[in-house]
Swiss-Prot record:
Probably part of an ABC transporter complex. Probably Responsible for energy coupling to the transport system. Its EC number is 7.-.-.-. It is a peripheral membrane protein. ATP binds at G37, P38, S39, G40, C41, G42, K43, S44. Residues 5-228 form the ABC transporter domain. It comes from the Bacteria. Belongs to the ABC transporter superfamily. It is found in: Cell inner membrane. Keywords: ATP-binding, Cell inner membrane, Cell membrane, Membrane, Nucleotide-binding, Translocase, Transport. CDD domains: ABC_NrtD_SsuB_transporters. This is Putative ATP-binding protein BAB2_1147.
Length: 260
């Protein structure tokens, strides 16, 4: 089976700074992959290249068998910032891309109803973003991305600004939506527990210049539950990922973490 996303010797330079050094990675159709690594290792840069928001200095990235040359409707992007239009209601935000595409009002309503229900925002369809909590705003952003029917979701620390309990709830909401439709997901995070809880595979990137260090499979069943999160199997994978990330930190950062 051909991969859905392929990074082939991807290099990214900013002037004299090498951000990515020959990154090679394949992500399968319908797979949920999380990407972790020390700060500055190029996680977000890799995602932005996949989104078509940056052009690599070398190598190529393929979606299916087509080179990525810019943004495309087959890729939806969700950032840590909610990026909602504050003057539009929740429903209007979800329907925005559909409206731009010329879809009929009846069809837009059908699609927005479905995804608002999926993320638990039906009762807030007519509310403005200012009336929503942080978690609700991000659920709206997820519904908007899903409504546009992308084949791939690229998510850059989408839950990073949320409190711990809301973050766990959002992880479950996202997995519920993913399990129903099996879009391909590339999810960037600094949270090791989050990375393991969500993913089929955890991609660990090496310290700068960014490159693939190792791929850690997550052999845990879906649906993921609190019992799985508390299981010895989860703890073992979580510890393996944590040690992989920790040993990628620059030596000075490791010393700081020990108070030296």
């Amino acid at each position: 089976m051909k991969p859905k996303i392929s990074f082939n010797n991807v290099v990214m330079r900013y002037g004299g700074f090498l951000a990515l050094d020959r990154l090679n990675l394949d992500i399968a159709d319908g797979e949920f992959v999380t990407v972790v690594g020390p700060s500055g290792c190029g996680k977000s840069t890799a995602m932005n290249i996949a989104a078509g928001l940056l052009q690599p200095s070398g190598g190529e990235i393929l979606v299916g068998d087509k080179p990525v040359t810019g943004p495309g409707p087959e890729r939806g992007v969700i950032f840590q910032q909610y990026a909602l239009f504050p003057w539009l209601t929740v429903r209007q935000n979800v329907e925005f891309g559909l409206s731009v595409a010329g879809m009929s009002r009846v069809k837009r309503r059908e699609i927005s109803d479905h995804y608002l229900s999926l993320v638990g925002l039906t009762d807030f369809a007519d509310a403005l973003p200012k009336a929503l909590s942080g978690g609700m705003k991000q659920r709206c952003a997820i519904a908007r991305a899903y409504a546009a029917a992308p084949e791939i979701l690229l998510m850059d620390e989408p839950f990073g600004a949320l409190d711990a309990l809301t973050r766990v709830h959002m992880q479950d909401q996202l997995l519920d939506a993913w399990s129903r439709e099996r879009r391909t997901v590339m999810f960037i995070t600094h949270d090791v527990d989050e990375a393991v809880y969500l993913a089929n595979r955890v991609i660990v990137m090496a310290a700068r210049p960014g490159r693939l260090d190792q791929i850690i499979p997550v052999d845990l069943p879906y649906p993921r539950t609190e019992a799985i999160r508390l299981s010895p199997e989860f703890a073992a994978i979580r510890n393996r990922v944590w040690h992989a990330v920790y040993h990628q930190q620059p030596q000075t950062d490791q010393q700081s973490s020990h108070g030296q």
